[in-house]
């Protein structure tokens, strides 16, 4: 008997590996399954590189299964070597706790917690913190062979350059997590990124050895790779965070709206809850009228709404449309700063007033001759208003909040002029 959820995951390309394909299908067909996915609090916010495993877990919730969302307050004190070429810097306990609180809030955007079968947040510090060193070595270490651990890719790739005993034992801690959740909540499936395969199978093996549990499974999702081979989730400005204070909803929206034609359908399948028919219709539009960018708009709107809400999405669209149209007058100072964060920032002495001198001093035009031509030809805009008078003098009215002026040269070249 096929399972609708698994068929949907396969269609979306979300299944990379399964420890027991028929076993997972059987339990999903016969019962409401409790399953989990975890993240270590390495920062006080998740970024979009963390999203896919948790969105996949949410798909299980949409089909009636119960997610456990694990925040690694314990394992975060240690550091996962998976996918890392060098040792992590240990965080203080206070920093880890701050990070846990930040991520907890974000999980409430991704999962439903307040229903009868809602998700549950758990922190592995609650049980790992209770295990003494002697208990760890006797109760758990005795069941884990060194040769078995050395066979893990996450360990092997680090042996050449060195790995501390601290990180070497990480996989045992995550294995303990799976066992604890299995015995406490009857959790039978762990979901994770493809780099978590070794940690997931360690948990299944530890449960089998310690108390004969054979009904435990793992499912991993693929690494998100862009068509150009570049790392997903990074911009020139760094990571794209879920925290609006780190990455504004406008910047978040812009990240998704700028998805290439080659990636957009894959990302619609990965990151949205749109049905197959809706995505296929967007794919048809992409093939027949790519200039409309309907697929990109659907992606940006759905993901931004899911993470930041409708109001933030509306603001992001409004700012985007105003900037595209050059309608700067309709935006507040904070929205302008947000929208022009990545344009060249230039400084101007407050004494300089004449428009020609202004655009030469700031480097917007290369010479006074070029500056005069730019002004005369209508290529210069002050705060969105074309200025064609070479004798124009900037006044306090041209300073937004007495702090900056937006100058545009040509159709799209913007500069934020800050006053010394």
Curated annotation (Swiss-Prot):
Compartment list: Cytoplasm
Binding site for L-tyrosine: 36, 170, 174
Entry's Gene Ontology cellular component terms: cytosol
InterPro entries: aa-tRNA-synth_I_CS, aa-tRNA-synth_Ic, Rossmann-like_a/b/a_fold, S4_RNA-bd, S4_RNA-bd_sf, SYY-like_C, Tyr-tRNA-ligase, Tyr-tRNA-ligase_bac-type
GO terms for biological process, alphabetical: tyrosyl-tRNA aminoacylation
Gene Ontology MF term list: ATP binding; RNA binding; tyrosine-tRNA ligase activity
Sorted UniProt keywords: Aminoacyl-tRNA synthetase, ATP-binding, Cytoplasm, Ligase, Nucleotide-binding, Protein biosynthesis, RNA-binding
EC id: 6.1.1.1
Motif ('HIGH' region): 41-50
Enzyme class: ligase
Protein family membership: Belongs to the class-I aminoacyl-tRNA synthetase family. TyrS type 1 subfamily.
Entries under HAMAP family matching the protein: Tyr_tRNA_synth_type1
Record note on quaternary structure: Homodimer.
Protein name: Tyrosine--tRNA ligase
């Amino acid at each position: 008997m096929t399972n609708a959820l698994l068929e949907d995951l396969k269609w979306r390309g979300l299944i990379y590996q399964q420890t027991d394909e028929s076993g997972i299908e059987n339990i999903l067909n016969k019962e409401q399954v409790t399953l989990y996915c975890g993240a270590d609090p390495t920062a006080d916010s998740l970024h979009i590189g963390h999203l896919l495993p948790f969105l996949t877990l949410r798909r299980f919730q949409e089909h009636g299964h119960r997610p456990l969302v694990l925040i690694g307050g314990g394992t975060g004190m240690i550091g996962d070597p998976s996918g890392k070429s060098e040792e992590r810097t240990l965080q203080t306990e206070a920093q880890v706790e701050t990070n846990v609180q930040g991520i907890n809030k974000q999980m409430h955007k991704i999962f439903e917690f307040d229903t009868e079968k809602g998700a549950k947040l758990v922190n592995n510090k609650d049980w790992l913190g209770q295990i003494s060193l002697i208990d760890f070595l006797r109760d758990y270490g005795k069941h884990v062979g060194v040769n078995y651990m050395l066979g893990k890719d996450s360990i092997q790739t680090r042996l050449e350059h060195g790995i501390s005993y601290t990180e070497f034992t990480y996989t045992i801690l995550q294995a303990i997590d799976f066992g604890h959740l299995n015995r406490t909540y009857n959790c039978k499936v762990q979901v994770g990124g493809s780099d978590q395969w070794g940690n997931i199978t360690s948990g299944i093996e530890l449960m089998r050895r310690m108390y004969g549990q054979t009904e435990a499974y793992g499912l991993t999702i693929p690494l998100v790779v862009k068509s150009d081979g570049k790392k997903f989730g990074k911009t020139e400005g760094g990571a794209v965070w879920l925290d609006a204070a780190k990455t504004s909803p406008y910047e978040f929206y812009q990240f998704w709206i700028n998805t290439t034609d080659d990636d957009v359908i894959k990302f619609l399948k990965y990151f949205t809850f749109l049905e197959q028919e809706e995505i296929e219709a967007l794919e048809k539009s992409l093939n027949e009228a790519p200039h409309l960018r309907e697929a990109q708009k659907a992606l940006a709107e759905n993901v931004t709404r899911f993470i930041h809400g409708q109001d933030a999405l509306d603001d992001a669209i409004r700012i985007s449309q105003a900037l595209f149209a050059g309608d700067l007058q309709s935006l507040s100072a904070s929205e302008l700063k947000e929208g022009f964060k990545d344009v060249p920032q230039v400084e101007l002495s407050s004494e300089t007033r004449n428009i020609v001198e202004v655009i030469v001093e700031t480097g917007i035009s290369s010479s006074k001759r070029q500056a005069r031509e730019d002004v005369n030809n209508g290529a210069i805009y002050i705060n969105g208003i074309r200025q064609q008078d070479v004798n124009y003098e900037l006044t306090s009215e041209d300073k937004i909040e007495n702090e900056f002026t937006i100058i545009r040269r040509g159709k799209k070249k913007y500069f934020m002029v800050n006053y010394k």
